Design a protein with these regions (language model features):
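Phosphate-binding/catalytic loops
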Residues: 20, 149, 187, 192-203
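Short hydrophobic/Thr-rich beta-strand motif most characteristic of the beta2 strand and flanking loop
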Residues: 54-60
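Short, charged N-terminal beta->alpha structural module
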Residues: 29-51
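Cysteine-nucleophile active-site neighborhood
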Residues: 30, 71-144, 209
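Catalytic beta-strand/loop cores that center a nucleophilic Ser/Cys/Thr
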Residues: 140-187
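Acyltransferase
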Residues: 2-14, 18, 200-225
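Short amphipathic alpha-helix with an adjacent loop that forms part of the alpha/beta core around
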Residues: 62-71
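Structural signature of beta-strand start/N-cap positions in the alpha/beta core
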Residues: 30, 54, 72-73, 101-103, ...
Length: 225
């Protein structure tokens, strides 16, 4: 897999979402991919490429916060450990939320929940390389066209604790055992998925990513438009 260089964009190339303008749904976008030291981050990068966007990969330890607004999307990768141990991850969420459409995957999803006031709980049983059924519990364009329920790949030992979820976050998908598999902010273009869309165990992963990349960034109707 070829290296993906981090290329800070100039303000003149900033996202039109920041000015309130609308993109055509299939327009190419520059996506800041925040690498939380996950061994399969390049699979996520490849999904972004396949969706017609240009990925710009940077370590979670080195994200220049003042350039986040210059991108059209911010994608938080999975990674080991807990969100609070992942460099500037919390700061990235705080900076991007409300400015740039934001999607967190696994660890990134957990970081979003924590920044907005939620907590995590450790699972009694680790899910590593496990295919699980996932059911949609709130309309979200991310999951448009997928079977109901749909299958996802899980690689985690922590989940967002439903009992601590703040009112500003809405659950959009659950596993069969009731674990939060996806959530979104009620008023901001911020969403997260606990499962791995880049995994071979998630057959609809590319569809989910394409919906996110092609959405116009409207808060109503979910992160997928």
């Amino acid at each position: 897999m070829s290296e993906v260089a981090f290329t800070p964009l100039e303000p003149a190339r900033a996202s039109s979402e920041a000015s309130g303008a609308k993109h055509p749904r299939r327009a190419a976008r520059n996506v800041l991919v925040v690498d939380c030291h996950d061994s399969f981050v390049y699979n996520l990068v490849q999904l972004v490429r396949e969706g017609g966007a240009v990925p710009h990969l940077v370590s979670c330890d080195e994200v220049p916060l003042d350039t986040i607004d210059h991108y059209d999307r911010v994608l938080l990768s999975p990674g080991p450990g807990l969100p609070g141990e992942s460099g500037r991850l919390f700061d990235v969420v705080r900076r991007a939320a409300g400015r740039v459409p934001l999607l967190g995957v696994c660890l990134g999803h957990q970081a979003i929940a924590e920044v907005f006031g939620g907590q995590l709980r450790q699972l009694a049983e680790v899910h590593h390389g496990v295919a699980s059924e996932c059911r949609v519990v709130a309309d979200d364009g991310l999951f448009a066209g997928l079977p109901r329920p749909f299958v996802v790949g899980r690689y985690h030992s922590w989940v967002v604790d439903r009992d601590t979820l703040p009112a500003c976050l809405e659950i959009t998908a659950l596993s069969a055992d009731g674990a939060i598999m996806a959530l979104r902010h009620r008023t901001l273009d911020v969403c997260g998925v606990q499962f791995h869309p880049e995994s071979i165990l998630t057959p609809g992963g590319s569809t989910i990513m394409n919906h996110w990349l092609c959405a116009e960034g409207e808060a109503e109707g979910g992160c997928g438009g």
